[in-house]
A protein has these predicted regions:
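A hydrophobic, multi-pass inner-membrane permease signature
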Residues: 1-223
Length: 223
């Protein structure tokens, strides 16, 4: 199975999309969550706007038209930027930031801290658990994504993620095996491909759980 260069290419592409999408989504969630948690005049409108997008989705065709208008079709960016975050993740991080004791923020403001210092030095250490929850969910969604690749980079096989190769191989297992060996087992190939696609994320899950448990119990001490 791993002698097929398409599987290796799929792994590399998927890792790129997972890392890029997760990091970009984490940054967007942190900044959006912080802004939404602050008491500003537009806070209510922005929260309502985020909630509205969770109930009404533009759909596949309008989304594709936007991606095409931005010139991202046929590129890796079409599989990294779209879907790296959503309104639910932003609201979760916002709620976590809003629960930080205001006395910490007031103490930082008295010491002359700006928004970036408050966000990363005061709020982030106490809310990293929830932020990591959104990051892990983003990573899992990026790892399992194949439909986006099938419409954004259908002819650019060098950009195909692992899951799209898995779909192609399992759907055409008979032809794939006939080309490789005359003594083939279609079911065995399908099982092997599925295990190869899911094993990495399953092995990483216990590590993520430990990080989440540690992050959830973090607190703060004013100094």
């Amino acid at each position: 199975l791993f002698q097929d260069s398409s599987i290796i290419s799929g792994y590399v592409n998927t890792i790129i999309y997972v890392i890029g999408g997760t990091l970009l989504g984490l940054v967007m969630n942190i900044f959006a969550g912080y802004i939404l948690s602050r008491a500003t005049k537009l806070r209510g409108f922005m929260i309502l706007y985020c909630v509205f997008t969770t109930m009404f989705n533009g759909g596949t065709v309008p989304t594709y038209m936007v991606i095409r208008a931005l010139g991202m079709t046929g590129t890796r960016w079409s599989l990294i930027i779209p879907g790296c975050t959503n309104a639910v993740f932003m609201l979760l991080v916002m709620n976590s930031f809003a629960q930080v004791d205001k006395s910490y923020v007031e103490a930082a403001e008295i010491d002359g801290a700006g928004h970036l210092a408050i966000m990363f030095k005061v709020m982030w250490p106490q809310c990293k658990g929830m932020a990591l929850v959104t990051a892990i969910n983003t990573a899992i969604m990026k790892w399992n994504a194949w439909f986006e690749a099938s419409i954004y980079v259908p002819n650019n096989t060098e950009y195909w993620p692992l899951q799209l190769w898995v779909k192609k191989i399992t759907a055409n297992a008979t032809d794939y095996l006939k080309a490789a060996t005359p003594n083939y087992d279609k079911g065995l190939l399908q099982y092997c491909v599925i295990v190869a696609a899911t094993l990495p994320i399953l092995l990483a899950f216990p590590f993520f759980i430990k990080k989440l448990e540690k992050g959830m119990v973090l607190g703060g001490v004013k100094g």
